[in-house]
């Protein structure tokens, strides 16, 4: 844990943990990173090297339909909130989805149209429950916070203000698996976003939510001061490893710190064509397989 422990009896006290101690002495340059970068390192050092260090990066495989689906929904919802309140209708959300639709990764036009129709239902149902007159504090907002070791940053899907004045981090999800409150509480990214949003907005922020559009469910958690401190400590722990690997790469060791970490997820890796271990560990998947699985799962 960095700095001094923040008081736990006030709202948002945990954010102070992330920034206290920053001026206590910084013998090294702060390491800039995002939760995505840290989690990529944790998942697979080889993929991390391909994603962030090796230039030019190895060629990727074809685009994934499930990634296009997520991008389409996120972009449509962001565009919906950019409208004036009178224009924010569920039907306009469906129209925006059609306008923002990303076609890449689907088997053919018929499959893309079928998935778009399914996603249109998600968006319509979701926006039926959103007050069009409520203005979020941020949409696709970049937030950042320095700690004793890092500069953490990331882009948040939505930052809401509740009627009691509290601030909530909202993350949209479009995958097949429904999410639980434990998923929201355990998410490193959401915890980091809460700390960073508090610093960026100068307001307490301890609540995080995962909005799962396929099921219309919300997984929520309210972090304690200690919980937010643990998220910062977790980020710093992962970053120490990633930074050491970065330095080794810069010094010429491009292999030792970056072993492949084969798993079933290798089927879905962008860099599968460049990784023999990944190809051996998991079967080939067509770019549209995940959206077929989503339909089969209901």
Question: Can you annotate each of these PLM segments?
Answer:
Residues 45-53, 163-171, 240-244:
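Active-site-adjacent bridging/hinge elements
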Residues 75-140, 146:
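A non-catalytic, helix-rich entry segment at domain boundaries
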Residues 65, 69, 111, 115, ...:
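Hydrophobic (often cysteine-bearing) scaffold residues that line and stabilize catalytic clefts
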Residues 141-237:
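Mg2+/Mn2+-dependent nuclease catalytic core
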Residues 38-58, 62-83, 116, 120, ...:
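Nuclease catalytic cores
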Residues 1-66, 287-298:
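C-terminal, charged and often intrinsically disordered regions of DNA end-processing helicases
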Residues 13, 32, 196-298:
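Metal-dependent nuclease catalytic regions and adjoining charged, substrate-binding loops involved
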Residues 34, 135-141, 152-156, 262:
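Short beta-strand or tight-loop elements
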């Amino acid at each position: 844990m960095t700095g001094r422990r923040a008081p736990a009896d006030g709202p948002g006290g945990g954010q102070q943990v992330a920034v206290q101690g920053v001026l206590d002495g910084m013998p090294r340059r702060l390491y800039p990173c995002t939760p995505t970068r840290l989690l990529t390192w944790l998942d697979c050092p080889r993929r991390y090297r391909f994603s962030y260090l090796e230039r030019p990066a190895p060629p990727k495989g074809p685009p994934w339909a499930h990634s296009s689906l997520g991008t389409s929904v996120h972009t449509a919802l962001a565009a919906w909130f950019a409208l004036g309140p009178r224009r924010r209708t569920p039907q306009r959300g469906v129209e925006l989805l059609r306008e923002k639709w990303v076609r890449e990764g689907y088997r053919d036009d018929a499959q893309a149209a079928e998935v778009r129709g399914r996603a249109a239902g998600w968006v319509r149902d979701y926006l039926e429950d959103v007050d069009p007159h409520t203005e979020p504090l941020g949409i696709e907002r970049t937030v950042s916070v320095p700690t004793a070791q890092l500069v953490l940053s990331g882009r948040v899907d939505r930052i809401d203000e509740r009627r009691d004045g509290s601030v909530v981090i909202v993350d949209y999800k479009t995958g097949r698996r429904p999410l639980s409150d434990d998923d929201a509480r355990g998410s490193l990214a959401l915890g980091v976003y809460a700390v960073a949003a508090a610093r960026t907005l100068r307001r307490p922020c301890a609540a995080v939510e995962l909005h799962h559009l396929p099921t219309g469910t919300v997984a929520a958690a309210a972090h304690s001061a200690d919980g937010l401190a643990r998220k910062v400590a977790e980020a710093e722990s992962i970053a120490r490893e990633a930074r050491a690997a970065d330095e080794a790469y810069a010094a010429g060791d491009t292999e030792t710190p970056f072993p492949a970490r084969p798993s079933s997820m290798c089927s879905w890796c962008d860099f599968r064509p460049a990784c023999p271990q990944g190809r051996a560990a998991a079967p080939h998947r067509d770019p549209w397989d995940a959206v077929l699985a989503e339909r089969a799962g209901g």
